[in-house]
């Protein structure tokens, strides 16, 4: 049975969805003020695999990734480039969708945009005001975290500990340093009318509102990068409790950072690897192998040496599938069976907190096993199992498949060897080698 590490309880727990076979999963997506870097894509690649595996277990997964298309960073970048905020956001939404397609991340059911839910956010905030969980300052409307008894439970800190790191200096009228903005009063950039004053919603409120609009609570899985644990997910939990007196999610899953040069990969630090640039050098499958070769709760320190290792793994898998498939074809052998031992191991690894890194090791071990046998039935089962596992990882390897002419070339090569026509045999052998068949 599947066990998942729950960030809320800080332990692995058996995964029991609220309404099986339905599973509701919400993952925080990008703020579209620039292209996505490699660190941004790590959660997207991982949760794509999560959905694929849950569907393999015969669950029906409704998977939502939101798009933050109104934000101070968008406004700042739009002003800098002298374009409209929405035009800038649309440009990077298109870039985001193109990247998902290139990386074969096609399992997302819906990508709501924050600007589509402004009216719902206004109603949501008014409810918080009516219930005493929010208050006004000259700068906007804030959430009163002191009214949430267990605020800080995701971060495992109480209010006194959180107070030390909070930023009261941004608004001296805040009742508590950790109170966060629900509706920002501003005239800069795009603003929206409200019953109170023109402004725009706070980021934490955008997600909390969209989740309640799209799902029956609690979510089965709420995911994102580890940097979202606090304050973003903590503040979503607080708002949901205050607004609807419900639990936001049964499981919180957080994907660790992807660093570069031993620092967090960040646009603000300028130490970023843009995915669009990396894809000019590497096949998308290699990027996915890099990401999935480390457990999602362990950080990755990106280097081009790691990329080369992932490329070598990709090449080993490609070479095996090409040669093995050719061997089965020339022997006119085909079956749909899977290797039960391999699949049992695969499920054991995935059901222990989705250990994709060990699954990739399993694939490499399977290829080594295959090199030690010529039994057609076994080789076919190895290949079928590998292809199924690769599909769950969202990796499609376009290995060479022989045509009738290629098969004829093989038999002509065998005849040339048999009749000791070595010159012709060398020519035919080279043709097969060039295509990776032998």
Swiss-Prot record:
Belongs to the class-I aminoacyl-tRNA synthetase family. GO terms for biological process: cysteinyl-tRNA aminoacylation. GO terms for cellular component: cytosol. It catalyses: tRNA(Cys) + L-cysteine + ATP = L-cysteinyl-tRNA(Cys) + AMP + diphosphate. A motif ('KMSKS' region) lies at residues 264-268. Its cofactor is Zn(2+). Keywords: Aminoacyl-tRNA synthetase, ATP-binding, Cytoplasm, Ligase, Metal-binding, Nucleotide-binding, Protein biosynthesis, Zinc. Its main location: cytoplasm. A motif ('HIGH' region) lies at residues 30-40. It comes from Onion yellows phytoplasma (strain OY-M). It comes from the Bacteria. ATP binds at residue 267. GO terms for molecular function: ATP binding; cysteine-tRNA ligase activity; zinc ion binding. CDD domains: CysRS_core. Zn(2+) binds at residues 28, 207, 232, 236. Monomer. This is Cysteine--tRNA ligase. Gene3D superfamilies: Cysteine-tRNA ligase, C-terminal anti-codon recognition domain (1.20.120.1910), HUPs (3.40.50.620). It is found in: Cytoplasm. Binds 1 zinc ion per subunit. NCBIfam families: cysS (TIGR00435). Its EC number is 6.1.1.16.
